[in-house]
Curated annotation (Swiss-Prot):
GO terms for molecular function: RNA binding. It comes from the Bacteria. InterPro entries: Hfq (IPR005001), LSM_dom_sf (IPR010920), Sm (IPR047575). Belongs to the Hfq family. Gene3D superfamilies: 2.30.30.100. Signal peptide: none annotated. Residues 10-70 form the Sm domain. NCBIfam families: Hfq, PRK00395.1. The gene is hfq. Keywords: RNA-binding, Stress response. RNA chaperone that binds small regulatory RNA (sRNAs) and mRNAs to facilitate mRNA translational regulation in response to envelope stress, environmental stress and changes in metabolite concentrations. Also binds with high specificity to tRNAs. It comes from Cereibacter sphaeroides (strain ATCC 17023 / DSM 158 / JCM 6121 / CCUG 31486 / LMG 2827 / NBRC 12203 / NCIMB 8253 / ATH 2.4.1.). GO terms for biological process: regulation of DNA-templated transcription; regulation of RNA stability; regulation of translation, ncRNA-mediated. This is RNA-binding protein Hfq. Homohexamer.
Amino acid sequence: MAADKQNLQDAFLNHVRKAKVPVTIFLINGVKLQGVITWFDNFCVLLRRDGQSQLVYKHAISTIMPGQPINLYEGDD
């Protein structure tokens, strides 16, 4: 049963990617990046802004804040 559940990180990133929700990413060194997540994998996130893409390694990310409220799961879970 646990194998067919998606982890929270992937569910969050996939939701903001599909919905093209603008995000603010804070890195562990305090740098703030803003844009739309266009792709991600186990190690990095591709962030797009003003026609430019930035590859950001997940180990450098502290926080990802969506620019609008999101609802990942529906129901009583």
